[in-house]
Amino acid sequence: MPRRREVPKRDILPDPKFGNVEVAKFMNVLMLDGKKSVAERIVYGAFDQIEKKAGKAPIEVFSVAINNVKPVVEVKSRRVGGANYQVPVEVRPSRRLALAMRWLREAAKKRSEKSMALRLAGELLEAAEGRGGAMKKRDEVHRMAEANKAFSHFRF
């Protein structure tokens, strides 16, 4: 964290094909070693697959999937009197989006389809329907928060 002044957030340019900032952000999450063209190919390939399989607009499927996977609450560790408590806290909007994208990426990586584009398409379609690995992760985080509701008075 900087000591002098707050570092301004950089604006992300929308992606070239759909003109959507969230898609561009997701490409950045997927990107490895600065290879943006590879990330673009994966995302656009996944969108083509979504259009073939579902027959819906891929942008709509993507935004529904992202909104379904976004967590509302999570737990943070808080040390009180020699004991660590998992305290449920509300997730701020920017972190919600970041977590949703990260979980979608990880769930897609764990799938068994041949190419990453196919895996991502499958995961996005499942997340849009409320199933899949990313949704499982979101539900797990929500369950943890629900189980530790008793410690919610230890706010940060």
Curated annotation (Swiss-Prot):
Record InterPro entries: Ribosomal_uS7, Ribosomal_uS7_bac/org-type, Ribosomal_uS7_CS, Ribosomal_uS7_dom, Ribosomal_uS7_dom_sf
GO molecular function: rRNA binding; structural constituent of ribosome; tRNA binding
Keywords: Ribonucleoprotein, Ribosomal protein, RNA-binding, rRNA-binding, tRNA-binding
Recorded GO CC terms: small ribosomal subunit
Domain of life: Bacteria
Record GO biological process: translation
Assembly mode: Part of the 30S ribosomal subunit. Contacts proteins S9 and S11.
General function of this protein: One of the primary rRNA binding proteins, it binds directly to 16S rRNA where it nucleates assembly of the head domain of the 30S subunit. Is located at the subunit interface close to the decoding center, probably blocks exit of the E-site tRNA.
Protein family according to the UniProt entry: Belongs to the universal ribosomal protein uS7 family.
Protein name as annotated: Small ribosomal subunit protein uS7
Natural source organism: Cupriavidus metallidurans (strain ATCC 43123 / DSM 2839 / NBRC 102507 / CH34)
